[in-house]
């Protein structure tokens, strides 16, 4: 799992450069209450986000899913959208902030 998470982070760093704000593991894997069927929840927050960039991020993560034969649930947000979710006290933003483990 550590190798997979390291690969996600390093691959995204190459793709996004200084546009990447944070990559966070959250959900059952971060809390430690996962089982063998649990997916891996990853939140990726970037400074700016276009439709094309979002597609590139999902493609990169899909390649890693195939390589490691795992299911990765990927949430990609711009800095602005993440701030909006936090301000509106949306559960997903709270979960990422509270239980998330930065990669």
What are these regions (language model features)?
Residues 1-21, 31-32, 36, 47-103:
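Catalytic core of pol beta-like nucleotidyltransferases
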Residues 38-44:
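Short beta-strand->loop micro-motif that forms the acidic, two-metal-ion catalytic signature
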Residues 28:
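P-loop (Walker A) phosphate-binding loop of NTP-binding proteins
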């Amino acid at each position: 799992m550590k190798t997979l998470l390291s690969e996600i982070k390093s691959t995204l760093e190459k793709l996004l450069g200084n546009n990447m704000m944070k990559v966070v593991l959250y959900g059952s894997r971060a809390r430690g209450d996962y089982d063998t069927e649990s997916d891996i929840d990853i939140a990726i927050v970037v400074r700016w986000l276009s439709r094309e960039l979002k597609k590139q991020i999902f493609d990169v993560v899909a390649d890693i899913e195939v390589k490691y034969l795992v299911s990765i649930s990927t949430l990609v947000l711009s800095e602005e959208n993440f701030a909006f979710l936090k301000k509106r006290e949306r559960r997903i933003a709270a979960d990422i902030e509270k239980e998330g483990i930065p990669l």
